[in-house]
């Protein structure tokens, strides 16, 4: 069995309210085991026989659309990947310490480097970005509501799916569900 973390996009926003027990039941129906949810923002930890990430994402997406009645884009990472995301320092430490918020966008696969200018166009005096593999780090030096950046704007402009989590959430996930040796 392999351990995974599923990050579900927009699970409890836009008028949708999903109980974590409903998510757990949907994952159990797929044959996954040791299912746990972590805060009510669409983070599900589970064990699966398959190690085929894309297949797992598709199965979860189909099951959740059937259960919930709407599309739920799913991003899977291993506990080792979550730990690496949490440890990574995308910006100078002083900038990170002073940031109003630091978020990480989980992407479906690696972003084509040719798209970087489109990401860089979102930079402002309060927003900056750093790409590392399949993750886009976003530092906001002021309140996020003052930022012109949003997940929806990112997806529209780049035609890529993403879901964002606070780096503190990733750190807590990594601490609670560490990689196994």
Q: How would you describe each model-predicted region?
A:
Residues 2-181:
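Surface-exposed, charge/polar-rich loops and edge strands
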């Amino acid at each position: 069995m392999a351990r995974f973390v599923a990050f579900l996009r927009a699970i409890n926003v836009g008028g949708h309210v999903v109980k974590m027990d409903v998510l757990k039941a949907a994952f159990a129906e797929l044959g996954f085991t040791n299912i746990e949810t972590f805060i009510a923002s669409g983070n599900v930890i589970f064990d699966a026989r398959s190690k085929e990430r894309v297949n797992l994402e598709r199965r979860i997406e189909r099951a959740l659309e059937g259960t919930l009645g709407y599309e739920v884009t799913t991003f899977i990472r291993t506990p080792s990947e979550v730990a690496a995301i949490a440890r990574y320092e995308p910006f100078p430490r002083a900038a990170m310490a002073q940031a109003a918020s630091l978020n990480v966008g989980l992407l479906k696969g690696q972003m084509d480097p040719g798209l970087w200018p489109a990401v860089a166009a979102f930079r402002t005096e309060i927003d900056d970005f750093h790409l590392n593999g399949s993750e886009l780090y976003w530092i906001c030096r002021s309140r996020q509501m003052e930022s012109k950046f949003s997940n929806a704007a990112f997806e529209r402009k780049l035609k890529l799916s993403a879901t964002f989590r606070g780096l503190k959430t990733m750190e807590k996930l990594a601490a609670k569900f560490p990689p196994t040796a």
